[in-house]
C-alpha cells in the first residue's frame, strides 16, 4: 500500500496536496483498495464553497456508493475531467492521474491539522 509523504490525509481516507494556492484532493490507496472497482465519480459541487468535512461528491463502485468529504474548507474549482470517461484511474493511480478535484483552501494552515503519512498508517493499521 502506498503512503506518499507529500500529501496530508483525513480519517475518512481522503488526501490533499497543496500546489501554490490550489490543492488537489483524492481518495487514498487504502480507500480505493477497500472500495474495489470504481465505475462512476460524481462531483456536483464544482464552483461551490464548502466547509471542512462536507460532502463534495460520491464514488460509485459495483456494490455501493460512498460519500467524499472535503478535507478542509474552501472552494471546489475543478473536477478531474479524465474521470468522466475513465473512473478506473482512481484505482490505478489514486495519488496522480486519479485525483478527484482541485480546490482553493479557505486557509492553507488548516492542512496542518490533518494527518501525515505516519499518522494515516496508524489509522489504517488500527
Swiss-Prot record:
Modified-residue entries (N6-lipoyllysine), positions: 63
Family affiliation: Belongs to the GcvH family.
Descriptive protein name: Glycine cleavage system H protein
Keywords for this protein: Lipoyl
Record organism: Bacteroides fragilis (strain YCH46)
CC cofactor: (R)-lipoate
Record's GO cellular component terms: cytosol; glycine cleavage complex
Subunit details: The glycine cleavage system is composed of four proteins: P, T, L and H.
Listed Gene3D superfamilies: 2.40.50.100
UniProt-listed InterPro entries: 2-oxoA_DH_lipoyl-BS, Biotin_lipoyl, GCV_H, GCV_H/Fam206, GCV_H_sub, Single_hybrid_motif
Function per UniProt: The glycine cleavage system catalyzes the degradation of glycine. The H protein shuttles the methylamine group of glycine from the P protein to the T protein.
Binding note for cofactor: Binds 1 lipoyl cofactor covalently.
One Pfam family recorded for the sequence: GCV_H
Record-level GO BP terms: glycine decarboxylation via glycine cleavage system
Domain of life: Bacteria
NCBIfam families membership: gcvH, PRK01202.1
Residue ranges occupied by any Lipoyl-binding domain in the UniProt entry: 22-104
Amino acid at each position: 500500500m502506498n503512503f506518499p509523504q507529500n500529501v496530508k490525509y483525513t480519517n475518512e481516507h481522503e488526501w490533499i496536496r497543496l500546489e501554490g494556492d490550489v490543492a488537489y484532493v483524492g481518495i487514498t490507496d487504502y480507500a480505493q483498495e477497500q472500495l474495489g472497482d470504481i465505475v462512476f465519480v460524481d462531483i456536483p459541487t464544482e464552483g461551490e464553497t464548502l466547509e471542512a468535512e462536507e460532502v463534495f461528491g460520491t464514488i460509485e463502485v459495483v456494490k455501493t456508493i460512498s460519500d467524499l468529504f472535503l478535507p478542509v474548507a474552501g472552494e471546489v474549482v475543478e473536477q478531474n475531467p479524465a474521470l468522466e470517461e475513465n473512473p478506473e484511474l482512481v484505482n490505478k493511480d489514486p495519488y496522480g492521474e486519479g485525483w478527484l478535484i482541485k480546490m482553493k483552501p479557505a486557509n492553507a494552515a488548516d492542512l496542518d491539522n490533518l494527518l501525515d503519512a505516519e499518522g494515516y498508517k496508524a489509522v489504517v493499521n488500527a
